[in-house]
Regions:
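Conserved alpha/beta-hydrolase catalytic His-Asp/Glu region
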Residues: 208-210, 225-284
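Conserved HGGG/HGGXW glycine-rich cap/lid loop of the alpha/beta-hydrolase fold
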Residues: 95-140
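Active-site loop/oxyanion-hole signature of alpha/beta-hydrolase fold enzymes
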Residues: 132-174
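Acidic catalytic loop of the alpha/beta-hydrolase fold
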Residues: 296-300
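Catalytic histidine-centered segment of alpha/beta-hydrolase-like enzymes
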Residues: 324-333, 337
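Short beta-strand/loop motif that positions the catalytic acidic residue
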Residues: 285, 291-293
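Alpha/beta-hydrolase fold catalytic core
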Residues: 2-103, 128, 345-353
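Flexible "cap/lid" loop of the alpha/beta hydrolase fold
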Residues: 188, 197-223
Length: 353
């Protein structure tokens, strides 16, 4: 049996080791948070004057644009690209479809580009003139020259973009996730310019985003495939990740490769946190609007979101997409495309203004 002094000494050693371990973990977490801030979310003032802005370096710009061009080769239909100049900077627009078809503007999710719609554009371009944009304050080929601080800055950007594209007041507008939130803001801002709107799993908008979304987003900002897949892909895109066919796995690889290279290449800062629309704002939506959500959505409960809309804004058409989560435009692309086309072309879905 050990003497009491030796037992106490051993306990103190274990305690010191435990405290040292905790301290090391805290330091590592703090260092990681500092790295995330300075690597990803640092403000633009220090770099906006550089010739390679919004990229971290000339080399990063060249590597990213080369990758982007190769990925563009997977766009399944013919397209014309335009760089549109506005007072906020320049916006890259990928245009497909027939000139005399009704216009459909596509706004991607945060951290994505116009290439997000690769699985959808073939069906949509048969019926619409597609304007797929790279968000001016996100990854891709667009480049802002002024800061974005309020939703009104985004609205001014879209106003000028639509004016320069000579889009008349019959625009169909569709956005996914963060792009869905931007679309909802524009529905409130300029309903007279829109024909119809489609909100696909819009970030916040209907229900507040969960805290889990935040910490998963931070961890998935680590440019590592294993971490990104475990932390974000298998959570938000679990229906797609569960598929073992080559097309699904290629879609996941493309998604992760795009995101990891963008994280390494860009100085990025999300300018405006997506907000939940008030009951009054939802009630005031007068243009025909479709809300699409996957049954396995993780940013909020699909059932709760539709229940709120049915209660406060029954004029908004709602649809739940089976066997899909936040990946619904990919894992159920044909069904989503069909729902969108039917809604946008349905004469019974008329303006209630």
């Amino acid at each position: 049996m050990l003497p009491k002094k030796k037992i106490k000494s051993k306990k103190r050693s274990v305690t010191r080791l435990f405290l040292a371990g905790c301290g090391t973990i805290v330091v590592l977490l703090l260092a990681f948070c500092i790295w995330v801030y300075f690597s990803l979310f640092s403000g633009q003032d220090a770099i906006q004057t550089s010739p390679h802005y919004p990229f971290k370096s000339v080399e990063a710009k060249e590597k990213y644009l080369d990758h982007y061009e190769k990925r563009s080769q997977k766009w399944p239909v013919a397209y014309e690209d335009q760089m549109i100049q506005t007072s906020q900077g320049e916006t890259f627009v990928r245009i497909s479809g027939f000139d005399d078809a009704p216009p459909l503007v596509l706004i991607p999710s945060a951290g994505a580009t116009s290439l997000l719609w690769t699985q959808n554009v073939e069906m949509l371009a048969d019926r619409f003139k597609i304007y797929a944009i790279d968000n001016i304050y996100d990854f891709g080929r667009s480049r802002n020259t002024r800061p974005f601080e309020t939703p009104n800055d985004l609205m001014l950007w879209l106003d000028e973009l639509f004016d320069t594209l000579a889009l008349e007041n019959n625009i169909n507008l569709m956005g996914l996730s963060y792009g869905g939130w931007i679309s909802s803001q524009y529905v409130l801002h300029a309903p007279e310019r829109l024909h119809k709107a489609v909100l696909i799993a819009p970030a916040a908008t209907i229900i507040q985003l969960p805290g889990e979304w935040a910490w998963r987003g931070i961890l998935s900002a680590i440019p590592n495939k294993f971490i990104m897949r475990k932390v974000m892909v298998e959570w938000a895109f679990k229906d797609l990740a569960a598929k073992d066919d080559a097309a699904s796995q290629t879609a996941i690889d493309d998604l992760m490769n795009d995101a990891i290279l963008a994280i390494k290449s860009f100085k990025f800062k999300m300018p405006i946190h997506p907000t939940v629309l008030s009951d009054h704002e939802l009630e005031s939506i007068s243009i025909p609007t479709l809300f699409l959500v996957g049954e396995n959505e993780v940013i909020y409960s699909a059932g709760d979101a539709i229940a709120r809309l049915n209660l406060v804004a029954p004029q908004i058409k709602t649809e739940i997409i089976p066997n899909a989560g936040h990946d619904l435009t990919v894992v159920q692309s044909e069904l989503v495309n069909t729902k969108v086309i039917e809604f946008l072309l349905d004469p019974m879905q008329s303006d209630s203004r």
